Amino acid sequence: MSYEFFDISSPKEMLEKAKREYARMKSDLNTDNIFNFFVTAYHVMDHIKTVSGVDPKAIQGMYDDDFRMCQFACNKGKHAILKTITPYSSFADSVGGGETIYEVVDGSKRVRVEYLADKLINKWEKFFRENGI
C-alpha cells in the first residue's frame, strides 16, 4: 500500500478516476461533480503523453469536437477568465423549477453534459483498446 497523497501514476489509473467522477456526476448532477469529471477526463491525456509511448498521431486524433468541449469545460471551471478565445459557452437552466439541465454550447449546437461525458468515457476506452494501454 502506498501512503502518497496523489498516487495516480498511469493513464489507466487516471481513466478509472474519470469513471468514478462520471458515476458521481450521473448520480448527483451538480456543478462540483461536473467540474470534477471534466477536469479529470481532460487530464487523462497528460498521463498518456508522459508515460504511455502512444504514437503522437493517435493522440492528435483524439482532439475532436467532443474533446475540445471537454477541454473548454475543464478550463472554464478552473479559471475565472479564459485567456483563449473559444467558440464554446456553458449553459444551465432549471426547467419549470425542476431538475437543472447543464449544457456545453457550440453556436446552435447544445450538448448536455451527461451525454458528452458518456461519449468521452467511451472514446477513452476505445482509444485505450486501440493503443494497447
What are these model-derived regions, one by one?
Residues 1-35, 53-133:
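Acidic, Ser/Thr/Gly/Pro-rich intrinsically disordered interaction regions
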Residues 38, 43-52, 80:
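Extended, well-ordered alpha-helical segments in internal regulatory regions
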